[in-house]
């Protein structure tokens, strides 16, 4: 049986770091207010001439180097992003060109903060079907360009960055991507959206969010999806080494852990370092877990994210 395994992980954050105190100089907020409500202490902002594809390429290079896979052996590139360089062509094809992955086909997936889980599921199924052997899965965002920097309810929450993994065919029975479950509820699309769009008004717009309701759905849906994937695979929380949830708000992560009785030491937390990076959130957290010595070979990991749409998803992986 074919199964996709994560062979390499890479991440990239822009050079410009903006602390909460620096934000407080431009909008009515404070470090104490932001940390207490979100757990965020800082975020990174892309340079004016830096595109989503640029960050995606840097993360992908590190993931490829970590995996030992040659770029010419990559068959598929999937980029999860809601902030592509241009309306078209896809960010993924630009990444393919910059990386010189001449043998790959490439496309974008847009599920906002859930995008990386969706991209993982798609790449995993391409590998399982035998259509590809090696896939680059990337989450990359420049959220700073769709923020209203005068709106403290949203501008303090987001940052820019990219993360990537290399998935490769692996026949070992208990290793790799074991299970993924994807969900969406389009009736809730008005809870989190941008004020613009190509067809809507021809401009990118800025993020608009009903934060309280999104918060409630996040706790409910992330908790339920984790329970579902555990039950589907006859596993208990005790058997899982790490839970990597979308890094949107520390309180969401803590409340999901409390609801499911997950020990806090099993929750991977990186939001304090880079804020909510949307589709880049999960691979950035994975990279942090690996680089800090937490994540080890054979660890059983649950990845879970929720985003606008509303979309959400969960993935069970043996490293």
UniProtKB/Swiss-Prot annotation:
It comes from the Bacteria. One of its GO terms (biological process) is fatty acid biosynthetic process. One of its GO terms (molecular function) is beta-ketoacyl-acyl-carrier-protein synthase III activity. CDD domains: KAS_III. Its EC number is 2.3.1.180. Its main location: cytoplasm. The keyword Acyltransferase applies. The active site is at 113, 246, 276. GO terms for cellular component: cytoplasm. Residues 247-251 are annotated as: ACP-binding. It catalyses: malonyl-[ACP] + acetyl-CoA + H(+) = 3-oxobutanoyl-[ACP] + CO2 + CoA. Keywords: Acyltransferase, Cytoplasm, Fatty acid biosynthesis, Fatty acid metabolism, Lipid biosynthesis, Lipid metabolism, Multifunctional enzyme, Transferase. It is an enzyme of class 2 (transferase). Pathway: Lipid metabolism; fatty acid biosynthesis. Pfam families: ACP_syn_III (PF08545), ACP_syn_III_C (PF08541). Coiled coil: none annotated. It is found in: Cytoplasm. Homodimer. Catalyzes the condensation reaction of fatty acid synthesis by the addition to an acyl acceptor of two carbons from malonyl-ACP. Catalyzes the first condensation reaction which initiates fatty acid synthesis and may therefore play a role in governing the total rate of fatty acid production. Possesses both acetoacetyl-ACP synthase and acetyl transacylase activities. Its substrate specificity determines the biosynthesis of branched-chain and/or straight-chain of fatty acids. Belongs to the thiolase-like superfamily. FabH family. PANTHER family: 3-OXOACYL-[ACYL-CARRIER-PROTEIN] SYNTHASE 3, BETA-KETOACYL-[ACYL-CARRIER-PROTEIN] SYNTHASE III. The last Arg residue of the ACP-binding site is essential for the weak association between ACP/AcpP and FabH. HAMAP family: FabH (MF_01815). This is Beta-ketoacyl-[acyl-carrier-protein] synthase III. It comes from Ehrlichia ruminantium (strain Gardel).
